[in-house]
Amino acid sequence: MGRGLLLGAVLCLGLECLPQVASAKVLRVPEKLATIQAAVDAARNGDEIRVSPGAYCGATIDKRVELVGVGHPRIIGCAGGPVLGVARVGFYLPGPNGKNPASGTKISGFVFDGRGVSSANLEPISFGIFARFARDIEISHNHFEGTAQAITSTGGDRWRIEHNRIHDLTVLDCTGPCTGGDGIVIQLARDEVAAPGGDAAPINRPEDNLILGNTIEGGPPDGFADFSMVGILILAADHTTVLQNDLRLRDNPAAAAVSQGILLTNTCCGTGKSYLPGVRHTILAFNDGRKSEVAIVVEGSGGANTQGLFLFRNRGEQQLETAQLLLSLSRSAAIPASARPQL
Protein backbone atom coordinates (compact mmCIF):
# COMPACT_ATOMS: atom_id res chain seq x y z
CA MET A 1 0.00 0.00 0.00
CA GLY A 2 2.81 2.36 0.89
CA ARG A 3 4.57 1.71 -2.41
CA GLY A 4 1.32 2.30 -4.31
CA LEU A 5 0.82 5.65 -2.63
CA LEU A 6 4.43 6.61 -3.33
CA LEU A 7 4.11 5.66 -7.01
CA GLY A 8 0.90 7.66 -7.26
CA ALA A 9 2.59 10.69 -5.74
CA VAL A 10 5.50 10.43 -8.18
CA LEU A 11 3.13 10.21 -11.15
CA CYS A 12 1.13 13.13 -9.81
CA LEU A 13 4.22 15.29 -9.46
CA GLY A 14 5.52 14.25 -12.86
CA LEU A 15 2.45 14.36 -15.09
CA GLU A 16 -1.00 13.51 -13.93
CA CYS A 17 -1.82 16.19 -11.41
CA LEU A 18 -0.13 19.23 -12.92
CA PRO A 19 -2.64 21.97 -13.84
CA GLN A 20 -3.36 22.18 -17.54
CA VAL A 21 -1.94 25.35 -19.10
CA ALA A 22 -3.72 26.47 -22.25
CA SER A 23 -1.32 27.30 -25.05
CA ALA A 24 -1.79 30.50 -27.01
CA LYS A 25 -3.69 30.11 -30.25
CA VAL A 26 -3.11 31.82 -33.58
CA LEU A 27 -6.29 33.25 -35.06
CA ARG A 28 -5.97 34.14 -38.74
CA VAL A 29 -7.81 36.95 -40.51
CA PRO A 30 -9.42 36.56 -43.01
CA GLU A 31 -8.57 32.87 -43.51
CA LYS A 32 -10.48 31.69 -40.43
CA LEU A 33 -12.27 34.80 -39.20
CA ALA A 34 -13.52 37.51 -41.54
CA THR A 35 -12.77 40.56 -39.40
CA ILE A 36 -10.29 41.66 -36.77
CA GLN A 37 -13.15 42.36 -34.38
CA ALA A 38 -14.43 38.79 -34.79
CA ALA A 39 -10.93 37.50 -34.02
CA VAL A 40 -10.67 39.66 -30.89
CA ASP A 41 -14.08 38.46 -29.74
CA ALA A 42 -13.04 34.83 -30.23
CA ALA A 43 -9.59 35.21 -28.66
CA ARG A 44 -8.44 34.44 -25.16
CA ASN A 45 -5.82 36.35 -23.24
CA GLY A 46 -2.41 35.71 -24.78
CA ASP A 47 -3.65 34.64 -28.22
CA GLU A 48 -2.10 35.95 -31.43
CA ILE A 49 -4.24 37.49 -34.15
CA ARG A 50 -2.42 37.31 -37.47
CA VAL A 51 -3.85 39.52 -40.21
CA SER A 52 -3.06 38.99 -43.90
CA PRO A 53 -2.83 41.77 -46.53
CA GLY A 54 -6.06 43.61 -47.26
CA ALA A 55 -8.24 46.42 -45.91
CA TYR A 56 -10.02 45.94 -42.59
CA CYS A 57 -12.23 47.90 -40.22
CA GLY A 58 -10.81 48.78 -36.83
CA ALA A 59 -11.58 46.94 -33.61
CA THR A 60 -12.17 47.47 -29.91
CA ILE A 61 -9.56 45.50 -27.97
CA ASP A 62 -10.79 44.25 -24.59
CA LYS A 63 -8.30 41.49 -23.80
CA ARG A 64 -4.56 40.88 -23.92
CA VAL A 65 -3.69 39.82 -27.46
CA GLU A 66 -0.86 40.13 -29.95
CA LEU A 67 -2.01 41.74 -33.19
CA VAL A 68 0.41 40.99 -36.02
CA GLY A 69 0.06 42.44 -39.50
CA VAL A 70 1.60 40.30 -42.26
CA GLY A 71 2.27 42.18 -45.50
CA HIS A 72 1.08 45.54 -44.10
CA PRO A 73 -2.70 45.13 -43.88
CA ARG A 74 -4.56 48.45 -43.84
CA ILE A 75 -6.88 49.58 -41.08
CA ILE A 76 -9.54 51.86 -42.53
CA GLY A 77 -12.42 53.91 -41.19
CA CYS A 78 -15.76 52.08 -41.17
CA ALA A 79 -19.23 53.04 -40.05
CA GLY A 80 -19.34 49.97 -37.81
CA GLY A 81 -15.87 50.43 -36.33
CA PRO A 82 -14.90 52.05 -33.02
CA VAL A 83 -15.45 55.78 -32.58
CA LEU A 84 -14.61 58.54 -30.13
CA GLY A 85 -17.41 61.03 -30.42
CA VAL A 86 -17.76 61.46 -34.18
CA ALA A 87 -14.18 60.45 -35.00
CA ARG A 88 -13.22 56.95 -36.14
CA VAL A 89 -10.51 54.92 -34.43
CA GLY A 90 -8.27 52.12 -35.68
CA PHE A 91 -7.64 50.06 -32.54
CA TYR A 92 -9.43 51.27 -29.40
CA LEU A 93 -8.48 50.02 -25.91
CA PRO A 94 -11.07 51.84 -23.80
CA GLY A 95 -10.13 50.98 -20.18
CA PRO A 96 -13.26 52.03 -18.27
CA ASN A 97 -13.10 52.87 -14.56
CA GLY A 98 -9.31 53.11 -14.48
CA LYS A 99 -8.71 49.49 -15.51
CA ASN A 100 -7.88 48.06 -18.92
CA PRO A 101 -8.27 44.33 -19.66
CA ALA A 102 -6.20 44.79 -22.82
CA SER A 103 -3.03 45.59 -20.84
CA GLY A 104 -0.09 43.64 -22.24
CA THR A 105 -1.33 43.86 -25.84
CA LYS A 106 1.18 44.09 -28.71
CA ILE A 107 0.45 45.69 -32.08
CA SER A 108 2.85 45.51 -35.03
CA GLY A 109 2.95 45.52 -38.81
CA PHE A 110 -0.20 47.51 -39.67
CA VAL A 111 -0.92 50.53 -41.85
CA PHE A 112 -3.47 52.91 -40.33
CA ASP A 113 -5.15 54.77 -43.18
CA GLY A 114 -6.21 58.26 -42.17
CA ARG A 115 -5.50 59.91 -45.50
CA GLY A 116 -7.74 62.89 -46.14
CA VAL A 117 -9.22 63.07 -42.65
CA SER A 118 -10.40 66.51 -41.56
CA SER A 119 -13.27 68.10 -39.70
CA ALA A 120 -15.08 68.17 -43.03
CA ASN A 121 -14.29 64.51 -43.79
CA LEU A 122 -14.48 62.14 -40.84
CA GLU A 123 -14.78 58.94 -42.86
CA PRO A 124 -11.06 58.02 -42.63
CA ILE A 125 -9.45 57.12 -39.31
CA SER A 126 -8.82 60.14 -37.09
CA PHE A 127 -7.08 58.25 -34.28
CA GLY A 128 -4.83 55.27 -35.03
CA ILE A 129 -4.31 53.49 -31.69
CA PHE A 130 -6.08 54.97 -28.68
CA ALA A 131 -5.96 53.60 -25.13
CA ARG A 132 -6.89 54.60 -21.60
CA PHE A 133 -5.28 53.15 -18.46
CA ALA A 134 -3.53 50.40 -20.42
CA ARG A 135 -0.21 49.03 -19.17
CA ASP A 136 2.66 47.15 -20.79
CA ILE A 137 1.58 47.92 -24.35
CA GLU A 138 4.00 47.46 -27.27
CA ILE A 139 3.42 49.41 -30.49
CA SER A 140 6.09 48.73 -33.11
CA HIS A 141 6.76 48.84 -36.84
CA ASN A 142 3.43 50.36 -37.85
CA HIS A 143 2.74 53.04 -40.46
CA PHE A 144 0.23 55.85 -39.92
CA GLU A 145 -0.92 57.79 -42.97
CA GLY A 146 -2.73 61.01 -42.19
CA THR A 147 -4.62 60.72 -38.88
CA ALA A 148 -5.05 63.56 -36.43
CA GLN A 149 -3.61 61.62 -33.48
CA ALA A 150 -1.68 58.48 -34.33
CA ILE A 151 -0.82 56.84 -30.98
CA THR A 152 -2.42 57.86 -27.69
CA SER A 153 -1.85 56.59 -24.15
CA THR A 154 -4.00 58.23 -21.49
CA GLY A 155 -2.92 57.26 -17.98
CA GLY A 156 -0.91 54.28 -19.28
CA ASP A 157 2.30 52.84 -17.82
CA ARG A 158 5.27 51.00 -19.30
CA TRP A 159 4.47 51.44 -22.98
CA ARG A 160 7.08 50.74 -25.64
CA ILE A 161 6.42 52.77 -28.80
CA GLU A 162 9.18 51.83 -31.22
CA HIS A 163 10.07 52.22 -34.89
CA ASN A 164 6.73 53.51 -36.14
CA ARG A 165 6.32 55.94 -39.05
CA ILE A 166 3.74 58.72 -39.04
CA HIS A 167 3.27 60.65 -42.29
CA ASP A 168 1.07 63.64 -43.15
CA LEU A 169 -0.09 64.16 -39.57
CA THR A 170 -2.93 66.68 -39.52
CA VAL A 171 -5.59 68.23 -37.26
CA LEU A 172 -9.34 68.24 -36.82
CA ASP A 173 -9.85 71.98 -36.86
CA CYS A 174 -12.37 73.95 -34.85
CA THR A 175 -15.02 73.91 -37.54
CA GLY A 176 -15.61 70.41 -36.12
CA PRO A 177 -14.09 68.32 -33.29
CA CYS A 178 -11.24 70.83 -32.66
CA THR A 179 -8.57 68.37 -31.55
CA GLY A 180 -5.56 66.33 -32.65
CA GLY A 181 -2.44 67.50 -34.41
CA ASP A 182 -0.31 65.15 -32.27
CA GLY A 183 1.70 62.15 -33.42
CA ILE A 184 2.37 60.32 -30.14
CA VAL A 185 0.59 61.36 -26.94
CA ILE A 186 1.48 60.33 -23.39
CA GLN A 187 -1.01 62.18 -21.23
CA LEU A 188 -2.53 62.51 -17.80
CA ALA A 189 -5.99 61.00 -17.34
CA ARG A 190 -7.84 64.13 -16.38
CA ASP A 191 -11.22 65.78 -16.07
CA GLU A 192 -14.11 63.46 -16.97
CA VAL A 193 -11.82 60.53 -17.84
CA ALA A 194 -9.82 60.56 -14.60
CA ALA A 195 -10.01 57.84 -11.98
CA PRO A 196 -10.61 58.96 -8.37
CA GLY A 197 -7.69 60.65 -6.65
CA GLY A 198 -7.00 63.69 -8.77
CA ASP A 199 -4.08 64.77 -10.94
CA ALA A 200 -1.40 63.55 -8.51
CA ALA A 201 -2.83 60.04 -8.13
CA PRO A 202 -0.52 57.41 -9.66
CA ILE A 203 -3.43 55.72 -11.45
CA ASN A 204 -4.00 58.87 -13.51
CA ARG A 205 -0.36 59.67 -14.26
CA PRO A 206 1.49 57.90 -17.09
CA GLU A 207 4.77 56.42 -15.90
CA ASP A 208 7.84 54.60 -17.27
CA ASN A 209 7.02 54.92 -20.97
CA LEU A 210 9.56 54.56 -23.80
CA ILE A 211 9.32 56.28 -27.20
CA LEU A 212 12.17 55.07 -29.42
CA GLY A 213 13.19 55.42 -33.05
CA ASN A 214 9.96 56.77 -34.53
CA THR A 215 9.64 59.05 -37.56
CA ILE A 216 6.91 61.69 -37.37
CA GLU A 217 6.11 64.10 -40.19
CA GLY A 218 3.32 66.62 -40.71
CA GLY A 219 2.28 70.23 -40.51
CA PRO A 220 -0.71 72.51 -40.02
CA PRO A 221 -3.06 73.25 -42.92
CA ASP A 222 -3.22 76.73 -44.41
CA GLY A 223 -4.92 79.24 -42.16
CA PHE A 224 -4.86 77.05 -39.07
CA ALA A 225 -4.22 79.04 -35.89
CA ASP A 226 -6.14 77.41 -33.04
CA PHE A 227 -3.43 75.33 -31.33
CA SER A 228 0.03 73.92 -31.90
CA MET A 229 0.93 70.70 -33.71
CA VAL A 230 3.24 68.31 -31.89
CA GLY A 231 5.21 65.23 -32.87
CA ILE A 232 5.55 63.81 -29.33
CA LEU A 233 3.39 65.30 -26.58
CA ILE A 234 4.20 64.56 -22.93
CA LEU A 235 1.45 65.96 -20.69
CA ALA A 236 1.92 65.71 -16.90
CA ALA A 237 3.69 62.35 -17.09
CA ASP A 238 6.51 60.77 -15.06
CA HIS A 239 9.70 58.93 -16.07
CA THR A 240 9.22 59.16 -19.84
CA THR A 241 12.19 58.27 -22.06
CA VAL A 242 12.27 59.69 -25.60
CA LEU A 243 15.21 58.49 -27.72
CA GLN A 244 16.38 58.68 -31.33
CA ASN A 245 13.18 59.99 -32.89
CA ASP A 246 13.16 61.81 -36.25
CA LEU A 247 10.79 64.76 -35.93
CA ARG A 248 9.66 66.62 -39.04
CA LEU A 249 6.93 68.97 -37.89
CA ARG A 250 7.40 71.55 -40.58
CA ASP A 251 6.55 75.22 -40.49
CA ASN A 252 3.71 76.43 -42.69
CA PRO A 253 4.10 80.18 -43.29
CA ALA A 254 0.40 80.29 -44.22
CA ALA A 255 -0.62 79.05 -40.76
CA ALA A 256 -0.10 80.74 -37.39
CA ALA A 257 0.00 77.39 -35.59
CA VAL A 258 3.44 76.44 -34.27
CA SER A 259 4.91 73.04 -35.18
CA GLN A 260 6.82 71.44 -32.30
CA GLY A 261 8.85 68.25 -32.42
CA ILE A 262 8.59 67.38 -28.71
CA LEU A 263 6.44 69.25 -26.19
CA LEU A 264 6.59 68.84 -22.41
CA THR A 265 3.70 70.62 -20.71
CA ASN A 266 1.20 70.55 -17.88
CA THR A 267 -1.44 72.66 -19.65
CA CYS A 268 -3.58 72.00 -22.66
CA CYS A 269 -6.65 72.55 -24.62
CA GLY A 270 -7.04 76.31 -24.35
CA THR A 271 -8.55 76.17 -20.86
CA GLY A 272 -5.70 77.89 -19.03
CA LYS A 273 -5.77 75.15 -16.39
CA SER A 274 -2.49 73.74 -15.09
CA TYR A 275 -2.26 70.11 -13.99
CA LEU A 276 0.05 69.51 -11.03
CA PRO A 277 2.49 67.94 -10.64
CA GLY A 278 3.74 68.69 -14.12
CA VAL A 279 6.10 66.63 -16.25
CA ARG A 280 8.76 64.91 -14.12
CA HIS A 281 11.93 62.88 -14.70
CA THR A 282 12.00 62.97 -18.50
CA ILE A 283 14.92 61.80 -20.64
CA LEU A 284 15.25 63.36 -24.11
CA ALA A 285 18.31 62.13 -26.00
CA PHE A 286 19.53 61.76 -29.58
CA ASN A 287 16.31 63.14 -31.08
CA ASP A 288 16.60 65.00 -34.39
CA GLY A 289 14.23 67.93 -34.73
CA ARG A 290 16.15 69.96 -37.29
CA LYS A 291 13.30 69.61 -39.78
CA SER A 292 10.75 70.85 -37.25
CA GLU A 293 9.89 74.48 -36.69
CA VAL A 294 11.01 73.98 -33.09
CA ALA A 295 12.63 70.73 -32.00
CA ILE A 296 11.92 70.72 -28.25
CA VAL A 297 9.64 72.93 -26.16
CA VAL A 298 9.37 72.70 -22.38
CA GLU A 299 6.55 74.94 -21.24
CA GLY A 300 5.86 76.45 -17.84
CA SER A 301 7.97 78.32 -15.31
CA GLY A 302 9.65 77.71 -12.00
CA GLY A 303 10.53 74.14 -12.87
CA ALA A 304 6.94 72.97 -13.36
CA ASN A 305 8.02 70.62 -16.15
CA THR A 306 11.79 70.40 -15.68
CA GLN A 307 12.08 68.34 -12.48
CA GLY A 308 14.60 65.61 -13.24
CA LEU A 309 14.78 66.62 -16.93
CA PHE A 310 17.81 65.18 -18.78
CA LEU A 311 18.70 66.47 -22.25
CA PHE A 312 21.51 64.96 -24.30
CA ARG A 313 22.59 65.42 -27.91
CA ASN A 314 19.27 66.46 -29.35
CA ARG A 315 19.38 68.40 -32.62
CA GLY A 316 17.35 71.45 -33.52
CA GLU A 317 16.07 74.52 -31.71
CA GLN A 318 15.22 74.01 -28.04
CA GLN A 319 13.08 76.30 -25.89
CA LEU A 320 13.00 75.68 -22.15
CA GLU A 321 10.48 77.64 -20.11
CA THR A 322 10.52 80.53 -22.57
CA ALA A 323 7.64 82.44 -24.10
CA GLN A 324 6.78 81.58 -27.68
CA LEU A 325 6.89 85.23 -28.74
CA LEU A 326 9.72 84.88 -31.24
CA LEU A 327 7.78 82.32 -33.21
CA SER A 328 5.10 84.87 -33.99
CA LEU A 329 7.10 87.97 -34.78
CA SER A 330 6.46 87.65 -38.51
CA ARG A 331 2.80 86.68 -38.10
CA SER A 332 -0.17 88.91 -37.59
CA ALA A 333 -2.19 86.29 -35.71
CA ALA A 334 -1.99 85.85 -31.95
CA ILE A 335 0.21 83.09 -30.59
CA PRO A 336 -1.75 79.83 -30.80
CA ALA A 337 -2.69 77.88 -27.72
CA SER A 338 -0.76 74.82 -26.64
CA ALA A 339 -1.67 71.35 -27.88
CA ARG A 340 -5.23 70.08 -27.75
CA PRO A 341 -5.11 66.27 -27.69
CA GLN A 342 -8.16 64.07 -27.69
CA LEU A 343 -8.64 62.78 -24.15
Regions found by a protein language model. Give the residues of each.
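Right-handed parallel beta-helix
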Residues: 68-72, 100-114, 135-146, 157-173, ...
